[in-house]
Amino acid sequence: ALSSAASDVYKRQGLIETLEKGPLAGYPVIGVKATLYYGSYHDVDSNELSFKLAARLAFQNACPKIKPTILEPIYEVKVVVKDEFVGTILGDMNKRRGRVLGMDQREGVQEITAEVPEAEISKYAIDLKAMTQASGRFSRKFLRYEEVPEYLIAKIVEEAKKYNTK
């Protein structure tokens, strides 16, 4: 038989397992505080599985109320290009959901600084080479996480469903 302390461990473990594969596209859930207000233990009917399932069901019932979202990594991107390619790069950054923060002129080249979601720059080296006749270069540095725009969440969830059913 389980002790009351063991049931608390199983409830916690059930919640942790549920949070590791969240409701939106299976990504982990972060920034959640959970408080157990009521739970009972019975020598005959209580077991590990029942407590884990109870924690999972409690979280699933709470999800519509907490309005989960998806976060994405944002990078600071510095692009150095010849003056003739500045317009092309600025337009491209806009297409990639980037926010241009500034530009610095240096001896015939411009350094463009922008914040761009990682998903939009995964193949940027190849694209930059094509846009600048192989003369541009860039660097990137992780900054923070931000919420994915609402219009993209449904697409991400749908793609994850396809991937998870294979």
List the model feature ranges, each with a label:
Residues 11-25, 29:
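Conserved P-loop NTPase/AAA+ ATPase motor core
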Residues 17, 36-40, 83-85, 118-120:
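Beta-strand elements of well-folded, non-transmembrane domains
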Residues 89, 124-127:
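Hydrophobic side chains in well-ordered alpha-helices
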Residues 115-123, 148-166:
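Short, low-order "capping/linker" segments at domain edges
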